[in-house]
């Protein structure tokens, strides 16, 4: 198993975001996390990625307990949060090289060049992130989630702001990625799940 959640609950004050949820993801599976806004999708993803530690229940990633091995687990997860935290004053390549340093990626220039090509960022490569369209900012977010070649990819609303052509390209990229990695993506759009997930 790649990802296992058992009896996971999370509250924000008196508001329950998650109430005793559980699921399992197999290696090489693309799974859609479907639900309306406010259903707890982002909270679940923040827990899986180690961004939220204040929860009840158990989370195991690649047979490691998240509470006992948070740094090892973070190293094997690529995460695109719903609010893509980019640095608007950095150039695309500069930002991605920064991410490779955080993950201690070997051959960073080669990895960045490959992910720029894979995510279709070449046409905008000379721009700062703050100058990019919403769709290209999403691509940069996806590139940063993939640049360290993670085993598990967590994508929170990855299709937000994409035009129809970009949607098709990103769907294809996620499907290709899912052949070798475990992918969990959240959305509130059923067609996205049908188009991408196993």
PLM features: what roles do these ranges have?
Residues 3, 10-198:
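ABC transporter nucleotide-binding domains
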């Amino acid at each position: 198993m790649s990802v296992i959640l058992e009896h996971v609950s999370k509250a924000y004050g008196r508001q329950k975001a998650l109430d005793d949820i559980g699921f399992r993801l197999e290696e090489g599976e693309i799974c859609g996390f479907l639900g309306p806004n406010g259903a707890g999708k982002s909270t679940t993803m923040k827990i899986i990625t180690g961004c939220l530690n204040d929860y009840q229940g158990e989370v195991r990633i690649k047979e490691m307990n998240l509470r006992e091995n948070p740094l090892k687990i973070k190293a094997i997860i690529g995460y695109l949060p719903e609010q893509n935290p980019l640095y608007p004053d950095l150039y695309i390549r500069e930002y991605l090289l920064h991410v490779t340093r955080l993950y201690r990626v070997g051959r960073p220039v080669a990895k960045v060049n490959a992910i720029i090509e894979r995510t279709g960022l070449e046409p905008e490569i000379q721009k700062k992130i703050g100058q990019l369209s919403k769709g290209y900012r999403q691509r940069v977010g996806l590139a940063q989630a993939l640049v360290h070649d993670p085993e598990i990819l967590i994508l929170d609303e990855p299709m937000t702001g994409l035009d129809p052509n970009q949607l098709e390209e990103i769907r294809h990229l996620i499907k290709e990625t899912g052949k070798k990695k475990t992918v969990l993506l959240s959305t509130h759009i059923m067609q996205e799940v049908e188009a991408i997930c196993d």
